[in-house]
């Protein structure tokens, strides 16, 4: 820390920051455009000018760009002198010459960095009266709208898209006063992180197309801090709602996880919550008759009547449901009758990952810690598709050597161009094994495309080279692969911070075991090694701690007639099991109850279908790949709009039924009560109470406001339905209020900020004005530290699938949207992405089958026909058929099954 003097005030600032960042984090307003805390400084916009003085005797000073100026001890700075004020005012006037001044029709209006900076710089009178330069806008896909006339040429978009996220299809064209930011032609942006352009751009050039369809100004929406539900990373998000519909998703800063960015899956896939087909009342089906029950008490009475004298009840949980909801189901049916709702293959992988996390011998890095790794070995996980923010962090880790070299070269880390030049010939190492090419191949030192079995063999040889301990037969490897394994092992042993990444998406236990063995052997030789094992869902780790049973084991109970009633919690069984088996399961049950917010095929087959809240309408806890428990909070109350709905959180439905069956009074009155019982009864969740403050938490005697203090029209939202002013819903589960009434001063409680705002800063750039944000410990790591280091390794089976001639082995292939259950119910994904889904087949196999790229093929398994378009790949191993398992009509049970492709379908 060092002391500087700004406008005659003394400030303690971080010496590693540039002057602009030091001032912003101290609460001093300086307008800027091209600087970004992650992208660094290039000094192109010239907007952040300030005056610095040599000493107290200096009356003239020197005009400098604060983003390009290092902080010096005792520095004297003025932001309010006449010269710098006039300079900044003149610069923003020049930037605005060709701007259309279309704020009233711009989606960024009210949340626009350009608006904030224009006001801050004092540019209030427009003097330019001549023809403005205009551009033709481009079609950039179904997520982002392009309005090039609003551009001020700050270069942030291309610096983020190309330099940071590694995109190649967006650039800058033209020269001088006529530059154009876009693609070389119209088309969908290819990057999995293109949505961040919406927040990176300080104007309205790139706007959220999904938000435009249900647009509301920022101050008229209701927000809540939440957790992205689409993968196991657990990114922090802010969810905005108006009129009972989710309007947009914004990034919520977390120092250890997502930082300033989200992936497109997390940002644009929220519309599953808004679909009209969603169930909002209970349905009872009996003897081909359907009865609607739009009352909570009547629904519980009907359930109790059905379950009254039954002892053969099973509960099937879900990895997309919260810890609290799964625990409530387990409490209702008993631990011995609780099923996790996942396949046996995934169950085995998940239990192994859980054991490794509990063992806690190898550190599990956060996303920010990934960026500090100097050698990464990625085994069998296409992380760009399964956990995209992991891939983004891997890209930054390749630049990690610069961060250790810049000190010796006297290059400040915020100096973007200097750091970029220093990095050109110095990068960290990345080694990849995968079924086929991936989006990270462009930065990989070596990529090995092979079957999962061959990837395990390569991993085993790497382990052998590191530890000189042969745990399996690897003589099947060719000489060139032995050399590859030695190169990988050498790089890992010479590294300071190696990282091994694998996971459950290949459904292969040996892949996880060999990843652990490699990491363990590196730790034995003194390396600061990290190990990341990814799972398939947002709460896979959390559910695994409840010690349930795999879904396949239900089949045995069906055969033994040990099932009378079934409760399915937020799960679609048709995604995991063959259709015939699920149908048999339902027929064997005298009553099947399904609780879900998605209109799944399982819900449609239920005898009693019960609507429940999704993550935007409920509060609860999920556990990410680190074992970090995080709380998400409801954004709005689903029963408070003009439509009468009977929707409760899943845990409330289950608890009401439990109390009714046991003839006792309700004793879980809020989420705090559920968490209290979980903490007491399950040791792994003993820290659950510490994840976030309870519902009684207040600041200055007030709950935290979900709405902006400028929110307008609250009492008139539904005046066309009812002229009487309704009371705002009361939230007994969290520390937030459903209103603008409440504490808005939450700067000291940043992990729980519903939306980003700071006086004078209405856009998401307000995050940059807070003091050093350190919410790294937000959430709670559930796994205790081990005190004894036990040297144990896993023994590999190394058994290949017994391949049958002329049959194709089905392997899971992953795509950003197609495999995700929630995304598949989002209309924008259904209309634009799912219809173009495809499988993968080897080029040589395609010649034998007489098919070409884009052809549609058909195959059969268990008397059910499947069809899909296919793309050809040279890297994909012969004899395999890659399918987007988890997508509708392609259940997970197909993994590692062998099928015969028996015909090509004409399209």
Swiss-Prot record:
Residues 221-277 form the 4Fe-4S Mo/W bis-MGD-type domain. Its EC number is 7.1.1.-. It catalyses: a quinone + NADH + 5 H(+)(in) = a quinol + NAD(+) + 4 H(+)(out). The keyword NAD applies. [4Fe-4S] cluster 1 binds at residues 99, 103, 106, 112. The keyword Metal-binding applies. It comes from the Bacteria. Residues 1-83 form the 2Fe-2S ferredoxin-type domain. PROSITE patterns: 2FE2S_FER_2 (PS51085), 4FE4S_HC3 (PS51839), 4FE4S_MOW_BIS_MGD (PS51669), COMPLEX1_75K_1 (PS00641), COMPLEX1_75K_2 (PS00642), COMPLEX1_75K_3 (PS00643). GO terms for cellular component: membrane. It is an enzyme of class 7 (translocase). [4Fe-4S] cluster 2 binds at residues 151, 154, 157, 201. GO terms for biological process: ATP synthesis coupled electron transport. [4Fe-4S] cluster 3 binds at residues 228, 231, 235, 263. Residues 83-122 form the 4Fe-4S His(Cys)3-ligated-type domain. Keywords: 2Fe-2S, 4Fe-4S, Iron, Iron-sulfur, Metal-binding, NAD, Quinone, Translocase. NCBIfam families: NuoG. Composed of 13 different subunits. Subunits NuoCD, E, F, and G constitute the peripheral sector of the complex. Belongs to the complex I 75 kDa subunit family. This is NADH-quinone oxidoreductase subunit G. It comes from Buchnera aphidicola subsp. Baizongia pistaciae (strain Bp). The gene is nuoG.
